[in-house]
Every structure is written in structure tokens, then in C-alpha cells.
């Protein structure tokens, strides 16, 4: 006996570990998935950097006309007036969600609910 240790059989283990990402039967690779919360944080950073409106313009315009219809029929809106309403509505909603998030954090929660 020369005192040398027998080589370990790790090659099979490594191959088995590597093949866990590939379906053994069909050979189809599983799609990459981010950990929960990673994409949400990335979206938060992206939207905080941007200044564009987040609600689509035409659906918002239809909503404004629908609400205005209840008060007076045949009202007309300048395009700038609808944009001003949308800016104000989005600013209000962003502030509301910020306050809601602070309340959730204060209550040691991560999910906000209606």
C-alpha cells in the first residue's frame, strides 16, 4: 500500500447536478426564473427613474368622459385638459401607494391589500 487515497467518484455527482436544469426525458431546458421580489425591485427602480405616464391615454380619456357624462352630457375636452387630469390622477395614486407601503412596513408586512 503506497498510502495514496483512492480517487473519489465525483464526476457522476457533478454530471447529475448539472443535468437537473435539463429535463432528462425531453432534453428541454427550464426557463430562467428570478427569485421572488427581484423583478419587482427592478421595476420599482425603473419606474422611479422614468417620468412618462403609466396609465394608457385612451382608456383614461374614456373614463374621464364616462364620469363627466354623469354630470353634463355633450361635454368637450381639450387634449391638454385630459392630460392635466391624468397627471394629477397619477400623482395622487403614486402618493397613495407610497403612504400605503409605509403603513405596510410599519405593520411589519410586505403585502398591501385593499
Swiss-Prot record:
Ordered alphabetically, the record's keywords are: Chromosome, DNA-binding, Nucleosome core, Nucleus
For whether the record's keyword set contains Plastid, the answer is: no
Going by the entry's taxonomy, the superkingdom of the source organism is recorded as Eukaryota
Q: What is its main location?
A: nucleus
List the GO cellular component terms.
Answer: nucleosome; nucleus
Subcellular locations according to the entry: Nucleus; Chromosome
**Pfam families named in the record:** Histone (PF00125)
What SMART domains does the database record attribute to this sequence? Answer: H3 (SM00428)
Which parts of this chain are annotated as the region Disordered?
1-29
For the keyword Nucleus, the answer is yes
**What job does this protein perform?**
Core component of nucleosome. Nucleosomes wrap and compact DNA into chromatin, limiting DNA accessibility to the cellular machineries which require DNA as a template. Histones thereby play a central role in transcription regulation, DNA repair, DNA replication and chromosomal stability. DNA accessibility is regulated via a complex set of post-translational modifications of histones, also called histone code, and nucleosome remodeling.
Family, according to the entry, reads as follows:
Belongs to the histone H3 family.
Could you describe the subunit structure of this protein? The nucleosome is a histone octamer containing two molecules each of H2A, H2B, H3 and H4 assembled in one H3-H4 heterotetramer and two H2A-H2B heterodimers. The octamer wraps approximately 147 bp of DNA.
Its recorded name reads: Histone H3-5
The organism's taxonomy opens as: Eukaryota, Sar, Alveolata, Ciliophora, Intramacronucleata
Amino acid at each position: 500500500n503506497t498510502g495514496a487515497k483512492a480517487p473519489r467518484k465525483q464526476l457522476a455527482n457533478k454530471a447529475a447536478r448539472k443535468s437537473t436544469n435539463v429535463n432528462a426525458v425531453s432534453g428541454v431546458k427550464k426557463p430562467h426564473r428570478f427569485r421572488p421580489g427581484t423583478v419587482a425591485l427592478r421595476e420599482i427602480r425603473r419606474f422611479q427613474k422614468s417620468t412618462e405616464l403609466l396609465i394608457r391615454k385612451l382608456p383614461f380619456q374614456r373614463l374621464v368622459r364616462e364620469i363627466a357624462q354623469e354630470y353634463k352630457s355633450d361635454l368637450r375636452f381639450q387634449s391638454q385638459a385630459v392630460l392635466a387630469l391624468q397627471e394629477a390622477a397619477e400623482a395622487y395614486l403614486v402618493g397613495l401607494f407610497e403612504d400605503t407601503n409605509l403603513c405596510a412596513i410599519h405593520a411589519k408586512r410586505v403585502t398591501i391589500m385593499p
